[in-house]
Protein backbone atom coordinates (compact mmCIF):
# COMPACT_ATOMS: atom_id res chain seq x y z
CA UNK A 1 0.00 0.00 0.00
CA UNK A 2 1.18 3.51 -0.83
CA UNK A 3 0.09 7.07 -0.16
CA UNK A 4 0.56 10.02 -2.51
CA UNK A 5 -0.27 13.29 -0.71
CA UNK A 6 -0.45 16.58 -2.56
CA UNK A 7 -0.03 19.71 -0.43
CA UNK A 8 -2.06 22.86 -0.81
CA UNK A 9 -4.60 25.09 0.89
CA UNK A 10 -8.34 24.35 0.72
CA UNK A 11 -10.77 26.88 -0.71
CA UNK A 12 -11.50 28.41 -4.07
CA UNK A 13 -9.33 31.47 -3.47
CA UNK A 14 -6.24 29.21 -3.35
CA UNK A 15 -7.24 26.74 -6.08
CA UNK A 16 -4.75 27.74 -8.76
CA UNK A 17 -2.01 29.33 -6.70
CA UNK A 18 1.66 28.35 -6.74
CA UNK A 19 1.40 26.97 -3.19
CA UNK A 20 -1.25 24.51 -4.43
CA UNK A 21 1.03 22.73 -6.91
CA UNK A 22 0.56 19.48 -4.95
CA UNK A 23 -3.24 19.72 -5.13
CA UNK A 24 -3.06 20.58 -8.83
CA UNK A 25 -0.95 17.50 -9.61
CA UNK A 26 -3.28 15.18 -7.66
CA UNK A 27 -6.33 16.71 -9.36
CA UNK A 28 -4.77 16.02 -12.78
CA UNK A 29 -3.84 12.46 -11.75
CA UNK A 30 -7.36 11.79 -10.40
CA UNK A 31 -8.90 13.19 -13.59
CA UNK A 32 -6.65 10.99 -15.74
CA UNK A 33 -7.58 7.90 -13.69
CA UNK A 34 -11.26 8.95 -13.43
CA UNK A 35 -11.17 8.97 -9.62
CA UNK A 36 -13.37 10.91 -7.21
CA UNK A 37 -12.17 12.35 -3.91
CA UNK A 38 -14.24 11.87 -0.74
CA UNK A 39 -13.78 13.52 2.67
CA UNK A 40 -11.83 11.44 5.20
CA UNK A 41 -8.82 11.85 7.54
CA UNK A 42 -9.09 15.68 7.56
CA UNK A 43 -8.61 15.58 3.82
CA UNK A 44 -9.98 14.48 0.47
CA UNK A 45 -9.10 10.89 -0.40
CA UNK A 46 -9.26 8.83 -3.60
CA UNK A 47 -7.99 5.30 -4.10
CA UNK A 48 -6.73 3.33 -7.06
CA UNK A 49 -4.50 0.41 -7.98
CA UNK A 50 -1.03 0.92 -9.45
CA UNK A 51 1.34 -1.93 -10.20
CA UNK A 52 -0.96 -4.36 -8.41
CA UNK A 53 -0.86 -2.30 -5.21
CA UNK A 54 -3.49 -0.09 -3.59
CA UNK A 55 -2.55 3.60 -3.70
CA UNK A 56 -4.33 6.36 -1.79
CA UNK A 57 -4.32 9.95 -3.07
CA UNK A 58 -4.73 12.55 -0.32
CA UNK A 59 -5.30 16.31 -0.39
CA UNK A 60 -5.15 17.48 3.26
CA UNK A 61 -7.83 20.07 4.03
CA UNK A 62 -6.11 21.37 7.18
CA UNK A 63 -4.33 24.28 5.49
CA UNK A 64 -0.69 23.95 4.57
CA UNK A 65 0.93 24.38 7.99
CA UNK A 66 -1.00 21.43 9.46
CA UNK A 67 -0.87 19.06 6.45
CA UNK A 68 1.06 16.43 8.37
CA UNK A 69 -1.94 15.68 10.62
CA UNK A 70 -4.03 14.43 7.72
CA UNK A 71 -1.10 12.46 6.26
CA UNK A 72 -0.36 10.81 9.62
CA UNK A 73 -4.02 9.91 10.20
CA UNK A 74 -4.36 8.11 6.87
CA UNK A 75 -0.94 6.45 7.13
CA UNK A 76 -1.66 5.20 10.68
CA UNK A 77 -5.12 3.90 9.80
CA UNK A 78 -3.90 1.91 6.78
CA UNK A 79 -0.51 1.09 8.36
CA UNK A 80 1.46 2.75 5.55
CA UNK A 81 5.16 3.10 6.39
CA UNK A 82 6.89 6.46 5.73
CA UNK A 83 9.00 4.82 2.99
CA UNK A 84 5.71 4.20 1.11
CA UNK A 85 4.58 7.83 1.32
CA UNK A 86 5.13 10.42 -1.41
CA UNK A 87 4.41 14.10 -0.68
CA UNK A 88 4.04 16.43 -3.68
CA UNK A 89 4.58 20.14 -3.03
CA UNK A 90 5.75 23.47 -4.42
CA UNK A 91 9.42 24.47 -4.18
CA UNK A 92 10.67 28.03 -4.70
CA UNK A 93 14.28 26.84 -4.95
CA UNK A 94 13.51 25.08 -8.24
CA UNK A 95 12.75 27.10 -11.36
CA UNK A 96 9.27 26.72 -12.76
CA UNK A 97 9.17 23.70 -15.02
CA UNK A 98 11.55 21.55 -12.93
CA UNK A 99 10.83 18.52 -10.76
CA UNK A 100 13.01 16.96 -8.10
CA UNK A 101 12.30 13.59 -6.51
CA UNK A 102 13.91 12.82 -3.13
CA UNK A 103 13.70 9.87 -0.73
CA UNK A 104 14.23 12.02 2.39
CA UNK A 105 15.58 15.35 3.57
CA UNK A 106 14.83 18.44 5.61
CA UNK A 107 11.79 20.69 5.26
CA UNK A 108 13.84 23.32 3.45
CA UNK A 109 11.65 26.05 4.95
CA UNK A 110 8.38 24.54 3.65
CA UNK A 111 5.79 24.55 6.45
CA UNK A 112 3.73 21.70 5.00
CA UNK A 113 6.82 19.48 4.96
CA UNK A 114 7.78 20.66 8.48
CA UNK A 115 4.35 19.54 9.67
CA UNK A 116 4.66 16.19 7.88
CA UNK A 117 8.11 15.53 9.39
CA UNK A 118 6.79 16.41 12.87
CA UNK A 119 3.67 14.23 12.54
CA UNK A 120 5.44 11.21 11.00
CA UNK A 121 8.43 11.59 13.33
CA UNK A 122 10.89 11.15 10.46
CA UNK A 123 12.35 12.89 7.40
CA UNK A 124 12.48 9.53 5.60
CA UNK A 125 9.52 9.76 3.26
CA UNK A 126 9.48 10.45 -0.47
CA UNK A 127 8.81 13.88 -1.84
CA UNK A 128 8.28 15.31 -5.30
CA UNK A 129 9.18 18.98 -5.44
CA UNK A 130 7.42 20.99 -8.15
CA UNK A 131 9.42 24.06 -9.09
CA UNK A 132 7.56 27.37 -8.87
CA UNK A 133 10.61 29.66 -9.02
CA UNK A 134 11.46 32.61 -6.80
CA UNK A 135 9.64 35.93 -6.75
CA UNK A 136 11.17 38.86 -8.55
CA UNK A 137 12.51 41.81 -6.57
CA UNK A 138 9.79 43.57 -4.64
CA UNK A 139 7.60 40.48 -4.18
CA UNK A 140 7.08 39.13 -0.69
CA UNK A 141 7.57 35.32 -0.66
CA UNK A 142 4.26 34.68 1.13
CA UNK A 143 2.38 36.83 -1.38
CA UNK A 144 4.20 35.12 -4.26
CA UNK A 145 3.27 31.54 -3.29
CA UNK A 146 -0.37 32.56 -2.74
CA UNK A 147 -0.58 34.23 -6.16
CA UNK A 148 -1.90 32.45 -9.24
CA UNK A 149 0.42 31.31 -12.00
CA UNK A 150 0.80 33.89 -14.76
CA UNK A 151 -0.59 33.38 -18.26
CA UNK A 152 2.98 32.84 -19.48
CA UNK A 153 3.64 30.19 -16.82
CA UNK A 154 0.52 28.09 -17.55
CA UNK A 155 1.91 26.11 -20.53
CA UNK A 156 5.04 25.28 -18.50
CA UNK A 157 2.87 24.31 -15.52
CA UNK A 158 0.75 22.00 -17.67
CA UNK A 159 3.86 20.28 -18.99
CA UNK A 160 5.43 19.85 -15.54
CA UNK A 161 2.19 18.52 -14.02
CA UNK A 162 2.06 15.91 -16.79
CA UNK A 163 5.68 14.95 -16.05
CA UNK A 164 4.89 14.87 -12.33
CA UNK A 165 1.99 12.47 -12.89
CA UNK A 166 4.33 10.16 -14.77
CA UNK A 167 6.94 10.43 -11.98
CA UNK A 168 4.56 9.55 -9.12
CA UNK A 169 2.99 6.75 -11.17
CA UNK A 170 6.41 5.25 -11.90
CA UNK A 171 7.35 5.63 -8.20
CA UNK A 172 4.18 3.76 -7.17
CA UNK A 173 4.59 1.00 -9.76
CA UNK A 174 8.36 0.46 -9.97
CA UNK A 175 10.01 2.31 -7.10
CA UNK A 176 11.76 5.56 -6.36
CA UNK A 177 15.20 4.84 -7.79
CA UNK A 178 13.84 4.28 -11.28
CA UNK A 179 11.66 7.39 -11.02
CA UNK A 180 14.59 9.51 -9.75
CA UNK A 181 16.85 8.35 -12.58
CA UNK A 182 14.25 9.31 -15.17
CA UNK A 183 12.81 12.54 -13.74
CA UNK A 184 15.66 14.26 -11.84
CA UNK A 185 17.10 15.86 -14.97
From Swiss-Prot:
This protein's name: Peptidyl-tRNA hydrolase
Feature type site, description Stabilizes the basic form of H active site to accept a proton: 90
Marked site positions, Discriminates between blocked and unblocked aminoacyl-tRNA: 9
Role: Hydrolyzes ribosome-free peptidyl-tRNAs (with 1 or more amino acids incorporated), which drop off the ribosome during protein synthesis, or as a result of ribosome stalling.
Gene Ontology CC entries for this record: cytoplasm
Subcellular location as annotated: Cytoplasm
E.C. numbers: 3.1.1.29
GO BP annotations listed: protein quality control for misfolded or incompletely synthesized proteins; rescue of stalled ribosome
Listed PANTHER family: PEPTIDYL-TRNA HYDROLASE
Tagged with keyword Transmembrane helix: no
Organism from which the protein derives: Desulfitobacterium hafniense (strain Y51)
A Pfam entry, by short name: Pept_tRNA_hydro
Database matches in PROSITE patterns: PEPT_TRNA_HYDROL_1 (PS01195), PEPT_TRNA_HYDROL_2 (PS01196)
Amino acid sequence: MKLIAGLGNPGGQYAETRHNAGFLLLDCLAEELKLDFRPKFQGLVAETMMGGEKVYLLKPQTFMNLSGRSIRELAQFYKIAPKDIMVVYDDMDLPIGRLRLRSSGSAGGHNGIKSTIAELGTEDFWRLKVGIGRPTAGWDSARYVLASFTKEELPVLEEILDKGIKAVTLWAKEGGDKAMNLYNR
